[in-house]
Amino acid sequence: MGDCFENILRTASSLKLREPVIDTVIRFSEDMCRWLLHLHLKLGTDIEVITVGGNHDTQRLLESRPTFEDENLTKFVVAYMKQRYEGIIGVDINDYQDIAIKNIRGTNIMFCHGEDKDLSTTMDYFSNLYNVDIDEGYGGHLHRPESKAIGITEVGDRMFTRVGSIVGIDTFAKKIRVAARPSVYVALYTDNGKTWGRNYYL
């Protein structure tokens, strides 16, 4: 869901960095490759990897605002994973995207970073842009998990789920007065749609 890295978004960001950003990108890319291989072998099933960028991954090269949103460090992660998994059967690395829409067991799911305030409008926009009915959406950005019903579909309520952050609370979270433990979200889909979902706290 993006925000793989702290990056240097503002001067205060440099206080949080434990190593150069590029070194973090390389280490994170390798860690993801090892984790995906372990997951693939442990579950004994094929894995499709969908990666979208976030605002923290964007390079702010000339100004304080991320005017060059295509300058995203997550593209390096995707390129690295594609290189590592080239020719390996069972792990499919999708191209980098700012948003992705995938059909999982008959449910059309949108994956985005989630920085928009009105996520219902975001889902409607991309439904119209790509001419596909989006049943559910996933995003992050706010560093806390929450789910919201924003309509109905053939497979049930049209839900948007914000997933938590593996970082948990940071200075931005404190500034906007939100707090949540570091977490990841896992969901199970069958032909009847999403049948199970859970936050795992780290």
Which positions does each model-derived feature cover?
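Acidic carboxylate-rich catalytic motifs and surrounding loops in phosphoryl-/glycosyl-chemistry enzymes
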Residues: 47-55, 91-100
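Core catalytic region of metal-dependent phosphoesterases/phosphodiesterases
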Residues: 1-81
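Active-site beta-strand termini and strand-to-loop segments that position acidic
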Residues: 102-106
